[in-house]
Amino acid sequence: MKLWGQILWTLLSVPRGRRGVLQGWAFNSWKTYSSLTGPLSATGMVNHWTRVFEERGIPEARESSEYIVAHVLGAKTFQSLKPALWTKPLTPQQLECIQELCGRRLQRMPVQYILGEWDFQGLSLKMVPPVFIPRPETEELVEWVLEEVAQRPHAVRAQDGPLILEVGCGSGAITLSLLSQLPKSRVVAVDKEEAAVSLTHENAQRLQLQDRIRIIHLDITSEGCCTHLLPWSPLDLVVSNPPYIFRKDMEQLAPEICSYEDLVALDGGDEGMDIITHILTLAPQLLNASGSIFLEVDPRHPELVSSWLQSHPDLHLSLVGVREDFCGRPRFLHVQKSAP
């Protein structure tokens, strides 16, 4: 899982190229299949499109072509296909579908949007642009929350399971992972974008988890947003992968991100702290006496968040833990509420 996670990270993190050149590549710049010799098999298509992607500067060329060919053949990954299918000649319909999907990849559409689904914490989630694509490191945030619930059962309501708020639910990846692994838990999930609210609803229904989730179309930066959430307090946990990219870094994002994903879900303001500070200001009003906040952040944020909390002692919040992602960067924060 972590290997594929690193592949996904590369797909979504390469330096931004010249976007104006990309759109013309889709259907007029690859060699035709007629130039290929031998049967047009799955392996042949992977090799062909890998070369095309490499020629056009598409990141992770082989992985992209393998995912697409496997998808057309009804599998999650190329390696999971039966070996007999690797060399079996493809039908004209399959070849046409592969060409269409690879054309989208040439336009730098993320593989997740091309396939229309992606796995997260073992769950198959529908993916629709421009809703934010869950990154592999966010799985580690979920794992940390699960560890905390297991190690500190006294800090959550033992009988009913934890009551959790997710800020910025996107596709529902974090919320639905927690619901699926904490059978007695309940989640209130909020997002300011209607498309994200709709997609979380759909994914919850696909996974039959809709009975334990309340999804609210809400901007937590809006005045009076707390009044919409108070009926569910006191909460045990707040979890979020908020917009945290420094505004000056937005121009360096890959074309896959800039052209297709909702940039509002990424832009965290000048220091990437705009939504983070809103969450930290809101959470104490909703959490129980020893409730916790788990955040995914930029590696520069642990120091900034610690300093900000020290300058706001009235919130009664303390940074009690920092964890690194699989690349060794400080990526996750655990902030805990204490008694006044």
UniProtKB/Swiss-Prot annotation:
One of its GO terms (cellular component) is mitochondrion. It catalyses: L-glutaminyl-[peptide chain release factor] + S-adenosyl-L-methionine = N(5)-methyl-L-glutaminyl-[peptide chain release factor] + S-adenosyl-L-homocysteine + H(+). Substrate binds at residues 241-244. It is found in: Mitochondrion. S-adenosyl-L-methionine binds at residues 168-172, 191, 241. Its EC number is 2.1.1.297. GO terms for molecular function: nucleic acid binding; protein methyltransferase activity; protein-(glutamine-N5) methyltransferase activity. Its main location: mitochondrion. The keyword S-adenosyl-L-methionine applies. CDD domains: AdoMet_MTases. N5-glutamine methyltransferase responsible for the methylation of the glutamine residue in the universally conserved GGQ motif of the mitochondrial translation release factor MTRF1L. Belongs to the protein N5-glutamine methyltransferase family. This is MTRF1L release factor glutamine methyltransferase. The lineage of its organism: Eukaryota, Metazoa, Chordata, Craniata, Vertebrata.
